[in-house]
Regions:
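Membrane-helix interface segments
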Residues: 17-25, 61, 65, 127, ...
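Cytosolic-side transmembrane helix boundary signature
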Residues: 55-58, 212-236
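Alpha-helical transmembrane segments of multi-pass membrane proteins
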Residues: 1-9, 23-27, 39-43, 72-76, ...
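Membrane-interface transmembrane helices that cradle and orient dolichyl/undecaprenyl
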Residues: 7-25, 33, 55-57
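Catalytic lumenal/periplasmic loop and adjoining terminal transmembrane helix
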Residues: 86-89, 93-104, 193, 231-382
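Hydrophobic/aromatic-rich transmembrane helices and adjacent perimembrane loops
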Residues: 1, 33-38, 42, 133-141, ...
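Transmembrane-lumen/periplasm boundary regions of multi-pass, lipid-linked membrane glycan transferases
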Residues: 34, 41, 48-177, 183-195, ...
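Transmembrane-helix signature of membrane-embedded glycosylation machinery that interfaces
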Residues: 8-11, 82, 217, 221
Length: 385
């Protein structure tokens, strides 16, 4: 995401003034971006190509422009090759691998929980609307409104002005920002790319989206430039909004990552969509047991599924020996496991087909924006803390 932002910025600078220095800066950014993710190459080509097209439309394509274009293209390629030694051993094989892996992520045959449906990525693909729905569900409403408004305004300008829309830095920036998130998103929808954990694999779209939102805000500001009171009210509303969102992040720390926008019903959300994909709640659950379990007694813990098991064991493995020694881990099917504290990651319990605990079984819950990401519960015969 960060390198996408840098590539977008450098393409704006290169288009504004196509010098050798700016071409080299763009080449470095594009090379690093492509090395990080192969989709970064597509973003870099898109940004560079649009900057080139804009220069042609403005009839600013002189000899020095040609030199800058060659430096940018060859420099980006050279930077990518130097950063990617595997490419030198077998260029065709390596490029085939990264392109295939970008289209169909093969290093992780996991599962998705989407709209109450469990999707096994080892043999299924997400529906084409998976990414836009996840973006809509997890993007704050005001930011989403600004993105959609800016996208609509920019598209209208494109239809009206055709290639002339690429004239001028402000208009070009609006079109470039829109293109950098809309075109990749449409491509991923068409290919139904195999991704997991919401739209984490598509976070490179986030900065161009925010750039579109910022452009929309600037359009609103220009409309209100001569209206003192509305301008102040708008600035105050924006500040209040950011304060509310920041407060929400602080209050839900360290589980703020499980955010869903306010229009998403919290009733049964745990069984419809993923929350704690990375077992962050396990750490909080273990710390709660350490603090609240009877002193001087071993803390027996078990789990509901293999992914939660991995989270429990991985967390305990990182603890100092003295703290870790209090915990005794047990398999859920063993005799001792029947009296152990049971740690349950809600997302992984649903993916494994395990029922969520009844209210009278719950000792502790870790919540994010009103939804439970993790429980500690025990059978009736277990020792209560």
């Amino acid at each position: 995401m960060d390198l996408t932002a840098v590539v977008l910025w450098q393409s704006l600078r290169l288009r504004e003034k196509p010098t050798m220095g700016r071409a080299l800066c763009f080449a470095l950014a594009a090379g690093f971006c492509t090395n990080t993710r192969i989709i970064g190459g597509a973003v870099s080509v898109l940004c560079g190509g649009m900057a080139l097209l804009s220069l042609i439309v403005e009839k600013r394509f002189f000899r020095r422009t040609w030199r800058a274009v060659l430096v940018a293209a060859l420099g980006a390629l050279g930077c990518y090759v130097l950063l990617t030694p595997a490419l030198l051993r077998d260029p065709a094989g390596y490029l085939t691998y990264v392109l295939r892996n970008s289209y169909s992520f093969s290093r992780w045959n996991g599962t998705l929980l989407f709209c109450g449906r469990v999707i096994d990525l080892s043999w299924q693909r997400p529906p084409f609307y998976y990414l836009p729905v996840m973006i809509a569900l997890t993007m704050p409403l005001v930011q989403m409104g600004l993105i959609l408004a800016g996208g609509a305004l920019t598209l209208r300008r494109c239809f009206r002005q055709k290639l002339e829309v690429l004239r001028g830095q402000e208009s070009f920036a609006a079109v470039l920002s829109l293109s950098c998130w809309l075109l990749p998103l449409l491509g991923m929808m068409a290919m139904r790319v195999r991704v997991y954990n919401g739209w984490r694999h598509a976070y490179f779209l986030f900065f161009p989206m925010m750039a579109t939102a910022g452009w929309t805000l600037n359009r609103i500001r220009l409309r209100l430039v001569a209206k003192k009171l509305p301008r102040r009210l708008g600035a105050g509303a924006l500040a209040a909004l950011l304060a509310v969102q920041g407060t929400g992040l602080a209050l839900n720390h360290p589980f703020q990552f499980a955010y869903y926008q306010p229009l998403v019903s919290r009733d049964g959300l745990e069984q419809r969509h993923e929350l704690d994909y990375w077992n962050v709640g396990i750490q909080a659950a273990l710390e709660w047991l350490e603090e609240n379990a009877p002193a001087g007694q071993p803390i027996r813990v078990t789990w509901t599924d293999r992914r939660t098991r991995s989270g429990v064991l991985s967390n305990l493995a990182l603890w100092p020996g003295e703290r870790r020694a209090r915990f005794v881990t047990m398999e859920p099917d063993s005799e001792e496991g029947a009296s152990a504290y049971r740690i349950l990651n809600t997302s992984y319990a649903v993916l494994a087909g395990e029922p969520l605990p009844a209210e009278n079984e719950i000792l502790y819950r870790a919540e994010s924006y009103g939804s439970a990401v993790c429980f500690i519960c025990v059978p009736k015969e277990a020792v209560q803390p």
